[in-house]
């Protein structure tokens, strides 16, 4: 998988829901004719109404080149390794995997949509909050719209009025992706002034990896900090599941089942040393004793305090179900 994924995604000609159809046509033309650049530009002009600008056409061709759908060999264009793979497979699962491997942010958008419908302005904010390296101007929605339209064209997202929602296929992808993409080599950019950074992201208790884009989505939703300890360094934060990863696989990618905790506080939570109730108040195991000033100050001394996490970020039934398993509560 490319370690330096593309930050810019370009739209295809033909309309918002026809990106894949256009991609298929381009790949078929290239595979059949191995055209020169002039022939490829001419084919675009003859295939799409109101398309004449060479620069506009070549911007799309260069994107496909960067993503390795097509390669230029001498004066001619041929299918690249990705173009060959997708053409042979011919299914949307393969195309989505390829697009996620080569572009920043598509998986995190699918995760975010699993929490509920989003307007295009909300999509834009989500992408910038989760992936600040994308770098477009906040408030602009063109780049966000291109990402949403690629997912629409592949059948994983649909538009209802002014909102974007997951399709059934989108839900299937999200439910599996949090574990299947755990070995992705992408990680969020770290400020060069930081002396510490985490190259892999594993939970403390079970040494379990999750998809880095799922992790980035969770940290973004929780303001990049642990609400118990105040730790705000990304390399020291974990994705903590209310209903456990191992016992409730159907809720692994459910954003209303996770919160950001420091590695130490994640371990304490998973061991039942503290929990939170449906009002987001801290509840502490009466048997929990410690000589650690940090644990005393951040957990024991805060018994009954309401922690600062976004309203309705956790499903009350998940919290109730988790707490029902704690004999001391």
What are these regions (language model features)?
Residues 1-183:
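Donor-sugar nucleotide-binding helix/loop cap in glycosyltransferases
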Residues 5, 39, 84-88, 98-102, ...:
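Amphipathic, alpha-helical segments enriched in basic
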Residues 71-72, 102-111, 150-156, 168-175, ...:
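Short, surface-exposed, charge-dense and proline/glycine-enriched linear segments
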Residues 73-74, 160-161, 228, 235, ...:
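A generic structural-conservation signal
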């Amino acid at each position: 998988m490319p370690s330096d994924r593309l930050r810019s995604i370009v739209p295809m000609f033909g309309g918002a829901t026809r990106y894949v159809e256009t991609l298929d046509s381009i790949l078929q033309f290239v595979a059949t004719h191995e055209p020169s650049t002039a022939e490829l530009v001419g084919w675009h002009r003859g295939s799409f109404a109101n398309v004449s600008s060479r620069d506009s056409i070549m911007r799309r061709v260069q994107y496909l080149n960067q993503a390795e759908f097509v390669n230029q060999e001498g004066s001619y264009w041929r299918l690249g390794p990705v173009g060959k793979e997708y053409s042979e497979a011919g299914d949307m699962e393969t195309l989505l995997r390829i697009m996620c491997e080569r572009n920043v942010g598509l998986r995190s958008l699918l995760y975010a949509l699993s929490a509920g419908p989003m307007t295009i302005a909300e999509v834009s904010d989500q992408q910038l909050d989760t992936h600040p390296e994308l770098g477009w101007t906040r408030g602009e929605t063109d780049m966000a719209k291109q990402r949403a339209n690629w997912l629409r064209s592949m059948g994983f997202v649909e538009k209802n009025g002014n909102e974007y929602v997951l399709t059934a296929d989108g839900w299937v992808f999200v439910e599996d992706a949090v574990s299947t993409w755990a070995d992705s080599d992408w990680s969020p950019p770290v400020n060069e002034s930081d002396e510490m950074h985490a190259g892999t992201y594993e939970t403390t208790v079970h040494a379990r990896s999750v998809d880095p884009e799922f992790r980035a989505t969770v940290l973004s939703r929780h303001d990049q900090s642990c609400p118990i300890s105040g730790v705000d360094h990304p390399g020291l934060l974990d994705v903590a599941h209310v209903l456990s990863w191992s016992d409730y696989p159907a809720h692994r990618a459910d954003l209303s089942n996770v919160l950001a905790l420091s590695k130490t506080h994640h371990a304490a939570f998973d061991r039942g040393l503290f929990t939170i109730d449906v009002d987001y108040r801290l509840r502490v195991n009466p048997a929990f004793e410690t000589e650690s000033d940090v644990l005393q100050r951040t957990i024991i001394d805060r018994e009954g305090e309401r922690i600062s996490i976004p309203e309705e970020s956790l499903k009350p039934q998940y919290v109730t179900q988790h707490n029902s398993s704690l004999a001391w509560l």
